[in-house]
C-alpha cells in the first residue's frame, strides 16, 4: 500500500494514519511517498516530513520519492482508465476495506476512517523520545498540572496567500475573544497555552485576563517544532481550535475528557 504525503503536518497525519491502518488490515508493506513535500514539485509548498517525528511503534515502512512518474500515470488513469481512479470529496466508506486499490492519493480528512481504531491511532502519534528534551518534559507537567486551556490560532498562509485564503476561511478575532471572555468569566484559575504560527498577531489582537504561556515562541527554529507542539497540545484539559487540521489533531490526541470548542 502506497500513501502519498502532501500538505502540512495535520494533513500528513490523516494520510499516514489511514495508510498504516490499511497496510495492517491487508498485512502488506507500507510505502510512504514524500515527493510532494519537495519544494521543486510544481504547485506544492515546501513542507517538512513531520510525521517521522512521531514514534509510529510497530509500523514497518519504506520511503520513496517517485511521485513525478506517478503524476503522469495518474492523469492517464483519470482520463482514460477512470474506473481505476476515483476522485471523491468527504468520507468514502469503501476505502476502509482496502480492496481494489493500492495507492492512497488524497487528504482523507475524516475521523470516521479511524472510528474502530482510535486508541491505536493515538498510540502511533506519540512523540519520539529523542524530541522529549527537558523543555518539553517541563511543559508536559505544567500543562497537565494546571487548568490548561489550549488555544490554537492558525494564520500563516491562510492570511498571507490569496489562493489559500479563498478556500480556507480564517477564523475572526471575535471567535477567539468571545470564547476567552466566556471561559474566564466562569473559571478564575485558567492558564492559557497559546500555539500559533503568528504569536505577534495573537498578542496584538487577543486579550487575556488569566495566565498565558506562548508555547510556540519557545520552539522557534526547532526542526521538530510542529510535532512537539501537537504533542504538547494533547496534554491540555480543554481546547479552542481553529479551522485547521493541525488544531484538529492536537485536540483529537488529547488525554483528558475536557471540552473542545470549534469554529
Predicted feature residues:
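Nucleotide-activated donor-dependent transferases that construct or modify glycoconjugates
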Residues: 1-8, 35
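A structural signal for isolated positions on well-ordered beta-strands in alpha/beta enzyme cores
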Residues: 2, 31, 150, 191-193
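Donor-binding and catalytic core of enzymes assembling or modifying cell-surface/extracellular glycoconjugates
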Residues: 9, 181, 185-263
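Short, well-ordered beta-to-alpha junction loops that form the rim of enzyme active sites
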Residues: 34-36, 153-154, 195-198
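Secretory-pathway luminal glycosyltransferase catalytic domains
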Residues: 42-188
Amino acid at each position: 500500500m502506497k500513501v502519498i504525503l502532501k500538505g502540512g503536518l495535520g494533513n500528513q497525519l490523516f494520510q499516514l494514519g489511514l495508510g498504516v491502518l490499511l497496510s495492517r488490515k491487508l498485512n502488506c508493506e507500507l510505502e510512504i511517498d514524500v515527493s510532494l513535500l519537495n519544494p521543486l514539485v510544481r504547485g506544492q509548498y515546501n513542507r517538512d516530513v513531520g510525521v517521522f517525528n512521531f514514534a509510529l511503534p510497530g509500523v514497518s515502512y519504506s520511503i520513496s520519492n517517485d511521485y513525478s512518474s506517478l503524476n503522469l500515470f495518474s492523469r492517464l488513469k483519470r482520463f482514460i482508465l477512470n474506473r481505476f481512479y476515483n476522485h471523491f470529496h468527504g468520507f468514502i466508506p469503501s476505502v476502509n476495506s482496502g480492496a481494489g486499490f493500492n495507492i492512497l492519493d488524497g487528504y482523507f480528512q475524516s475521523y470516521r476512517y479511524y472510528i474502530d481504531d482510535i486508541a491505536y491511532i493515538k498510540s502511533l502519534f506519540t512523540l519520539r523520545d529523542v524530541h522529549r528534551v527537558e523543555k518539553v518534559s517541563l511543559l508536559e507537567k505544567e500543562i497537565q498540572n494546571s487548568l490548561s486551556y489550549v488555544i490554537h490560532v492558525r494564520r500563516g498562509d491562510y492570511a498571507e496567500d490569496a489562493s489559500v485564503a479563498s478556500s480556507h476561511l480564517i477564523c475572526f478575532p471575535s471567535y477567539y475573544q468571545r470564547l476567552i471572555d466566556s471561559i474566564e468569566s466562569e473559571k478564575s484559575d485558567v492558564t492559557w497555552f497559546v500555539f500559533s504560527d503568528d504569536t505577534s498577531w495573537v498578542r496584538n489582537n487577543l486579550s487575556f485576563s488569566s495566565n498565558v504561556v506562548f508555547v510556540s515562541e519557545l520552539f522557534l527554529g526547532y526542526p521538530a517544532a510542529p510535532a512537539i507542539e501537537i504533542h504538547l497540545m494533547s496534554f491540555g484539559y480543554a481546547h479552542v481550535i481553529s479551522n485547521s487540521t493541525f488544531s484538529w489533531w492536537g485536540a483529537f490526541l488529547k488525554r483528558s475528557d475536557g471540552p473542545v470548542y470549534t469554529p
